[in-house]
Amino acid sequence: CKFCQIYGLTETTGPFTCLPFEHHVDEKLLSCGRPMFGARAKVTGANDEDLPPGEIGEICYRGESLMVGYWARPEATADVTRGDWFHSGDAGYMDKDGFIFIKDRIKDMILSGSENVYPAEIEAVLASHPDIVECAVIGIPDKKWGETVKAVVVKRQGSTLTEATLIEWARDKMAGFKRPRSVDFIDKLPRNASGKLLKRTLREPYWQGLQRRVN
């Protein structure tokens, strides 16, 4: 069976990139593909400047299929359509061949010291633990580093997994600044009606009265 991967957002009103079967080789498999016919993409930095291939920033799109705007929300529309490009809120990069690689949502990125930490990478590692049903990774306040990594975990029924054993298990599986410094065990991760994980709900108890550098 030949598998074709596509990627799009509600705001793109359909698929915007495609990774056809013939490109399922080597590192290209980690990509969501290249923009489809009539679509364009680029990656921008903190000041909306264009970034070179391989550098992580915000993925932006342009094309005829993009939304006109958010209903009755002109300010929100203006914020995401700066410079006639749709700013997706996705962090990622484009390689020299024009393939797009998504790292995470920018608002979920953790700023720990001088490092940008992408929760999706950590979640993928933790999810491979046999005692973990599902997990989420968030940033919580830290006086020294600004933010540190916390894992929120749903473990299998009857599991004896502890915070200490999970942190030790992760020690040789990821860089030190990516490893969780603390773990919460809960019965169920919060989700909205469509099943989307609500990381803001997980972060809120730790950030009351404080301001994140990422929002």
Predicted regions: what is each one?
Residues 1-27, 40, 47-48:
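Gly/Ser/Thr-rich phosphate-binding loop
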Residues 4, 183-186:
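General small-molecule cofactor/ligand-binding pocket signal
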Residues 8, 33, 90, 114:
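Active-site glycine-centered loops adjacent to acidic/histidine catalytic or metal-binding residues
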Residues 30-36, 50, 80-84:
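Short Gly/Pro-enriched turn/cap motifs at secondary-structure boundaries
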Residues 42, 53-67, 85, 91-92:
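AMP-binding/adenylate-forming core of the ANL superfamily
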Residues 47-50, 63, 68-69, 76-79, ...:
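AMP-binding/adenylate-forming catalytic core of the ANL superfamily
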Residues 205-215:
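Acidic/polar alpha-helix N-cap and adjacent early helical turns
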